Structure formats: C-alpha cells, structure tokens
Design a protein with these regions (language model features):
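Hydrophobic, small-residue-rich alpha-helical packing segments that form membrane-like cores
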Residues: 1-24
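Exposed, low-structure sequence patches enriched in small/polar residues
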Residues: 10-12, 25-320
Length: 320
C-alpha cells in the first residue's frame, strides 16, 4: 500500500468590464467589452475584446461588430465555441413605408456579412447574406434570404456528427442556400413561427431544414411552447442520406412584475442527447437582475447525471 497526497489546483476565473453607449437622440448605440480568463499555466493571449456600433433611424439600420478571442482564452462556465481568431460583422437594412391603406407597415432589403480571420490575417470563414423583409401592420413578419457560405475547417469535422468519418482539417467548403421565415403576430394568445431553408452543405452535399415553434399564453402568468426541427442531409458515401429531429418544449412563468422562471427541455436525435435548461430571474432594480441558471445534458431522459452546471449571474445598472 502506498500513501499518496493530491492537491486540487484546477480552477477557472473570468474577470471583465463592459461599457454600453446610448446617444441622447437614440440613433446611436454601442458596446465595448473586455474579458480575461485565469487558469493554471495560462499567462498570455487569454482574453476577449469585442465591440459594436449601431445606427438606427426610421428607415436605415447599420451595424458593425468586431471581436478578438485569444488562443488561450478559457470559459469553463459559459460558452466560447472557438478561440484564436478575429471576427468582423456588418449588417445593413433599409425600410420603405407604403401608404396608410396598405396592410404592410414596412418592407426593404437587407445585407449581412460575417468574416473570421486567423492571427496571420488569413480568412478562414466567410458568410454573406442578401435578403428582403416584409413587416405587416399586425406585427407579423416574413423574411426571404439568399446565403453564401465559405468555411476552412480548423479541425477534423464529422458533417453529420455520428462518428462515421470526418472531413480533414484545412479543407475548404463552399455552398449557397435560400431561406424563408415567417413569424405570426406576437400579440395573439396563440403564436407560431415557421422557417425552411434549402441549399448546399459540406463536401458538395445538400441540406434541407425545417423549423416550427408554436406557443400559447395563459395570460398573464404562463406561456407554453413546442419546438420541432428536422434536418435532411444528403452526402456522398460513407455518410449517405440522413435525417435528424430536434424536439423541445419551453415554459415561461411570470410570478410578479419582477420575478420570472423559464425552462427548456429538448431531445437532439443527432447527438442522442436530452438537454435541460432552467433559469430563475429576479429584477431587483430597474435594468438590474440576478440570474440563477441550471444546465444539464444526458443520453437518457430524466435521469441523474454528472454533466450539469449551476451558474449565478448578477447585473447592476449604473447611470453616469
């Protein structure tokens, strides 16, 4: 028998600052954010810097956003899907307002672009979107978009995430797609949203997506929603043709003007996972909140598991 002594030196902390700007005429708003992570053995390139600036009047909206994520940035509690990149986004929209007797409130073109670069300035991901939106007077809306996607895989990637085979790192993939979305008027007790897209996919494949969300409000305390999503993917062998469902239910409870409780429970057929998210919110002062959030995921439904986290977040609004 040999006695051993162990020490737990694993930790992860994040410290940051956020500045929000709103102009007196409400035409301009922006944000600057800096976050630094602290973990054992990490001393440099472990921070995030991000900022955005938006101009919005009755007709024109323009927005630019940039972010930098260091190679060693780590957020054990939170979500940072990738590191080691620069990102630059642009959004433009112009609205026309027809005559008073029209059922359409506004309509107009929109443009969006997002670009990722590595630290050598080489483009690794690029997405471009061109579309047209229609907003009706009953507050329902419809959007038609065309998208072009370019991706350089930074790591091996399984396009259907079932473990059959992975595409190689640094391979390039391009495709186009068309997307149509409709949201019903939000003031109704019964609401719904529909979205469908068709186009290319990795490895010169094809993908068709359908999403639907239906909800009903029991005024003024409860809102229940059901979500259904289906993905149909066609690829060459060995992947072949596959279809995957994503099913979920949401519930939102309003106990008082300042206390809220929401839940999301869903099953992801592609990853064979049950996911549960529960969030309690207390607005203790205007624009100031306390959030308590529980997340878990498991391969079996309604079973205790070790893959869960509990997060406490406190926001305090200061007027300067």
């Amino acid at each position: 028998h040999e006695d051993t002594k162990t020490t737990n030196e694993e930790y992860n902390r994040n410290l940051g600052l956020e500045y929000n700007y709103f102009s007196a005429d409400n035409l301009w708003n922006g944000k600057l954010m800096y976050l630094k992570s602290f973990s054992p053995g990490s001393t440099d390139d472990d921070a995030i810097f991000a900022g955005n600036l938006t101009y919005n009047d009755n007709n024109f909206l323009g927005r630019v956003q940039t972010e930098y994520v260091g190679e060693n940035y780590n957020a054990e509690v939170g979500y940072a899907p990738r590191t080691h990149y620069y990102k630059f986004d642009t959004s433009l929209r112009y609205l026309f307002f027809p005559s008073q007797d029209s059922k359409i409130l506004s309509h107009g073109p929109l443009f969006g672009s997002n670009q990722y670069f590595n630290f050598d300035g080489v483009g690794i991901d690029r997405g471009t979107q061109l579309g047209y939106e229609v907003n009706f007077k009953n507050r329902s809306e419809m959007v038609l978009t065309f998208e072009n996607q370019f991706i350089v895989l930074q790591n091996p990637f399984d396009p259907i995430r079932t473990g059959i085979q992975s595409l190689g790192a640094l391979t390039e993939h391009r495709w186009n797609s068309i997307n149509l979305a409709y949201d019903s008027k939000p003031q109704s007790l019964f609401t719904y949203a529909l979205e469908s897209s068709y186009g290319g996919y990795f490895q010169d494949g094809k993908r068709w997506l359908f999403f639907s969300e239906m909800g009903y409000r029991f005024q003024p305390y409860v809102e229940l929603n059901a979500l259904v999503s289906y993905s149909h993917i066609e690829l060459e062998e060995p992947w072949g043709t596959n279809g995957f469902w994503l099913l979920g239910v949401k519930s939102n409870f309003t106990f008082t003007r300042n206390i809220f409780y929401s839940n999301l429970y869903q099953y992801n057929e592609q990853q064979k996972l049950w996911n549960f998210n529960s969030r309690f919110q207390w607005r203790y002062k205007p624009a100031s909140d306390i959030f308590l959030v529980f997340n878990s995921s498991d391969t079996r439904m309604l079973t205790p598991n070790r893959n869960w986290n509990l997060t406490l977040k406190i926001n305090f609004w200061i007027n300067l």
